[in-house]
């Protein structure tokens, strides 16, 4: 590896760390905002999105830990941990959304939830794109996989936003728990990809 290559790699690593620290900070703030909004609106979608933020914090911590070490076993462990985080999220959302739909539970409107999920969707899509580019440049599968976690976070934010807007505007209460099923689909797909690759 030349000096120029080493400098380029160091710059990419710094970018990777910066993206993960930004994600951590955003999701820590998100847990506080979503906790208040979910309780006030009694919304399963906002509660589930808060759990997703907690899992995203864990996934970012895994990547920071992995980037601080060497490749090989640390990458394999990192990918497995992210896979387990996906599994926890999928099980929670599947169970919670099903219970709420079966019970016919009606959440309240949440202006705070609408604003936060709209801004979060834009932020997560931007961070996910940055992680994907940086992960490819570093040939780092953990950063690339966590980038997909962040992308799913953005998709969930958009789905929750749609559910909140439909509930507030049209009274479609079922759109709130139905939003949880969107993430379950993507989470299961990522779990299969991570573990079928033999990590």
Feature names for model-found ranges:
Residues 1-199:
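Alpha-helical transmembrane cores and adjacent cytosolic helix/loop segments
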